[in-house]
C-alpha cells in the first residue's frame, strides 16, 4: 500500500491535495494508528471500568461505540488543522496507553510486599505548639476573595482510585505531595485529591482524558497555566477540577529527596513542611487559617513530628530562636536579604538573597560562571551560590511591617525557602532548621503592607480531545 492509499484509508475517503500534503509527513504515525488492534484496546478499557469505576458503569456496547467513533473521527472532519490534531492524539494513545494506564489492571507479581518506611509517631505530640503557631499567623481578617479552585468534579473519585495504583506502578517517574502524601504518613489526615509531580504529565493526561471519555462519555479539557511552572490541570464540562500534575525532567525527579511508603514515593516531609511555612507569605494562605484551621493543624502536626524524629530534634531545645528573622528588604530593587551566619560558622553560604523578580535572578545566573541548582516546581526557583551568598527567586508576596522590614511571617517564609535548598542538596543545616522550627510562633504584628509577587507572562494553553486542539509543549 503506497502513501496515498494509506492516507485515503485513514481518512475513509480520497484525500484532496492540501490534506494529502499535510498528512504526507505523518505517514509513519498513521501506519501505527491503522495497525493498532482496537479489540485489544477495548479489553483494557473494560478491565479499567470493572476495577476502578464503581458507580454508573457504562455498557460494553456503549464503550465500544465511543472507541470506534473516536478512531474514525477523521472520516467526518474536513479542516486540515483538526485532522492533524486527531492524528497526534490518536498516536499518543496507541503508542503509550498500555504502559501508562493499561498496565494498572495487569497483575504486578514482580513487586514484593513493601512495608512503610516511616516509624509509628505520635502526631499529636506538638499539637499545642502548632496551634499557637497557626494562631500567631492569623494576621488577616479572612475576608479575602475566594480562591479559584473551589469546584471539584464528580469524576474525582474515579480518577483517585486509579492514581493510587498509578503512583505504585510508576514510582520511578511519578510521586506525590500534599494531603494524600500526609495521609500515607498519618491515616487520620483527610485528602480530597492527589497532587502529583511526574516526568510525563502531558502524555498521562491525554490518556486519562481518552479513558474518561470512553468509560464515562464525559468530556474533559487540559490547560497549561503560565504562572505556575510546568503545571497542567484537567477540568470537566463545568470547569470543575479533576486532577492536576506538575511536569519535571527525569534529572530533577531523581534529584528531589523523597521517601517510599507502600510502594509510593512522596516528597521528603521536611521539604513539604518548609514549603508550607513558605506559602504562608501568601495572603490567601493566611486567609485559610480562618476556614481550614483544623485541617492545617493536623497537617502541620504530622509534618513537624516527622521532621523532629528524622532530624533528632526537639522543640524548646537549642538556641537562636528568631535569629533567622534578621532580614531586610530593599523596596526599589525588590530584594530581600536574610543574615543566617549568627547560627554558626559552618553554614555556607550564610547570606541569603531573594529576588522577587525572576528576571533579576536569571540575569545574575547568566552573568555567573557557576552552575545554578534547579529543583523545578518544588521550589519554583533556581539557586546560585556565589561570593558567599545564596541567591534565589521568591515567587510569593512579601508582608512588610510599618517600618518597612519583612514581617515575621515572611521572615520565616524566606528562611524556609532557602532552607529547602540545603535540605534538597544534603548540605548541613540542622542548627538553622532547628532555629526556624523553634521560631514558628511569631510576635503579634497584625499591621502589614503587601509587596506584590512577580507577574508571570504567558498565555493559557488548551488541549482538548473533544475539540481537536493539540499543542506540543
Swiss-Prot record:
<keyword id="KW-0507">mRNA processing</keyword>
<dbReference type="InterPro" id="IPR038419">
    <property type="entry name" value="PolyA_pol_nucTrfase_sf_Poxvir"/>
</dbReference>
<dbReference type="InterPro" id="IPR024231">
    <property type="entry name" value="PolyA_pol_nucTrfase_Poxvir"/>
</dbReference>
<keyword id="KW-0067">ATP-binding</keyword>
<dbReference type="InterPro" id="IPR024397">
    <property type="entry name" value="Poxvirus_polyA_pol_cat_C"/>
</dbReference>
<comment type="function">
    <text>Polymerase that creates the 3'-poly(A) tail of mRNA's.</text>
</comment>
<dbReference type="GO" id="GO:0005524">
    <property type="term" value="F:ATP binding"/>
</dbReference>
<keyword id="KW-0547">Nucleotide-binding</keyword>
<dbReference type="Pfam" id="PF03296">
    <property type="entry name" value="Pox_polyA_pol"/>
</dbReference>
<protein>
    <recommendedName>
        <fullName>Poly(A) polymerase catalytic subunit</fullName>
        <ecNumber>2.7.7.19</ecNumber>
    </recommendedName>
</protein>
<keyword id="KW-0808">Transferase</keyword>
<feature type="active site">
    <location>
        <position position="193"/>
    </location>
</feature>
<dbReference type="InterPro" id="IPR038337">
    <property type="entry name" value="Poxvirus_polyA_pol_cat_N_sf"/>
</dbReference>
<dbReference type="GO" id="GO:1990817">
    <property type="term" value="F:poly(A) RNA polymerase activity"/>
</dbReference>
<comment type="subunit">
    <text>Heterodimer of a large (catalytic) subunit and a small (regulatory) subunit.</text>
</comment>
<dbReference type="InterPro" id="IPR037265">
    <property type="entry name" value="PolyA_pol_cat_sf"/>
</dbReference>
<dbReference type="InterPro" id="IPR024398">
    <property type="entry name" value="Poxvirus_polyA_pol_cat_N"/>
</dbReference>
<dbReference type="InterPro" id="IPR004976">
    <property type="entry name" value="PolyA_pol_cat_Poxvir"/>
</dbReference>
<keyword id="KW-0804">Transcription</keyword>
<comment type="similarity">
    <text>Belongs to the poxviridae poly(A) polymerase catalytic subunit family.</text>
</comment>
<dbReference type="Pfam" id="PF12629">
    <property type="entry name" value="Pox_polyA_pol_C"/>
</dbReference>
<feature type="active site">
    <location>
        <position position="195"/>
    </location>
</feature>
<dbReference type="Pfam" id="PF12630">
    <property type="entry name" value="Pox_polyA_pol_N"/>
</dbReference>
<dbReference type="GO" id="GO:0006397">
    <property type="term" value="P:mRNA processing"/>
</dbReference>
Amino acid at each position: 500500500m503506497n502513501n496515498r492509499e494509506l492516507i485515503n484509508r485513514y481518512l475513509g475517503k480520497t484525500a484532496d491535495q492540501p490534506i494529502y500534503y499535510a498528512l504526507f509527513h505523518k505517514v509513519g504515525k498513521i501506519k501505527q494508528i491503522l495497525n493498532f488492534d482496537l479489540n485489544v484496546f477495548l479489553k483494557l478499557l473494560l478491565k479499567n471500568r470493572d476495577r476502578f469505576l464503581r458507580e454508573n458503569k457504562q455498557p460494553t456496547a456503549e464503550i465500544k461505540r465511543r472507541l470506534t467513533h473516536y478512531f474514525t473521527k477523521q472520516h467526518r472532519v474536513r479542516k486540515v488543522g483538526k485532522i492533524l490534531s486527531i492524528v497526534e492524539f490518536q498516536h499518543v494513545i496507541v503508542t503509550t496507553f498500555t504502559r501508562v494506564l493499561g498496565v494498572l489492571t495487569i497483575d504486578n507479581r514482580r513487586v514484593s510486599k513493601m512495608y512503610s518506611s516511616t516509624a509509628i509517631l505520635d502526631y499529636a505530640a506538638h499539637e499545642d505548639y502548632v496551634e499557637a503557631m497557626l494562631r500567631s499567623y492569623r494576621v488577616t481578617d479572612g475576608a479575602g476573595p475566594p480562591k479559584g479552585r473551589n469546584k471539584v468534579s464528580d469524576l474525582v473519585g474515579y480518577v483517585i482510585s486509579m492514581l493510587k495504583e498509578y503512583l505504585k506502578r510508576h514510582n520511578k517517574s511519578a510521586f506525590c505531595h500534599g494531603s494524600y502524601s500526609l495521609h500515607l504518613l498519618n491515616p487520620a489526615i483527610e485528602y480530597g485529591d492527589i497532587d502529583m509531580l511526574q516526568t510525563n504529565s502531558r502524555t498521562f493526561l491525554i490518556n486519562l482524558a481518552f479513558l474518561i471519555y470512553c468509560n464515562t462519555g464525559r468530556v474533559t479539557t487540559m490547560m497549561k497555566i503560565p504562572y505556575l511552572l510546568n503545571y497542567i490541570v484537567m477540568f470537566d464540562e463545568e470547569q470543575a477540577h479533576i486532577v492536576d500534575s506538575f511536569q519535571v525532567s527525569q534529572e530533577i525527579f531523581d534529584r528531589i529527596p523523597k521517601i517510599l511508603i507502600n510502594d509510593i514515593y512522596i516528597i521528603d516531609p521536611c521539604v513539604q513542611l518548609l514549603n508550607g511555612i513558605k506559602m504562608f507569605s501568601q495572603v490567601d494562605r493566611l486567609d485559610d487559617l480562618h476556614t481550614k484551621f483544623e485541617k492545617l493543624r493536623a497537617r502541620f502536626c504530622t509534618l513537624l513530628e516527622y521532621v523532629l524524629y528524622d532530624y533528632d530534634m526537639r522543640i524548646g531545645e537549642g538556641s537562636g530562636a528568631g535569629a533567622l528573622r534578621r532580614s531586610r528588604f530593599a523596596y526599589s530593587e525588590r530584594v530581600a536579604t536574610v543574615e543566617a551566619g549568627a547560627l554558626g560558622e559552618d553554614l555556607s553560604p550564610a547570606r541569603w538573597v531573594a529576588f522577587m523578580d525572576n528576571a533579576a535572578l536569571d540575569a545574575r545566573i547568566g552573568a555567573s560562571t557557576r552552575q545554578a541548582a534547579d529543583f523545578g516546581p518544588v521550589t519554583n526557583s533556581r539557586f546560585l551560590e556565589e561570593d558567599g551568598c545564596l541567591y534565589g527567586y521568591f515567587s510569593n508576596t512579601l508582608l512588610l511591617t510599618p517600618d518597612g522590614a519583612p514581617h515575621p511571617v515572611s521572615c520565616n517564609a524566606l528562611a524556609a525557602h532557602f532552607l529547602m535548598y540545603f535540605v534538597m542538596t544534603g548540605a548541613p543545616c540542622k542548627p538553622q532548621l532547628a532555629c526556624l522550627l523553634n521560631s514558628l510562633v511569631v510576635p503579634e504584628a497584625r499591621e502589614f503592607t503587601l509587596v506584590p509577587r512577580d507577574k508571570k507572562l504567558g498565555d493559557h494553553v488548551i488541549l482538548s480531545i473533544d475539540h481537536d486542539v493539540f499543542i506540543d509543549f
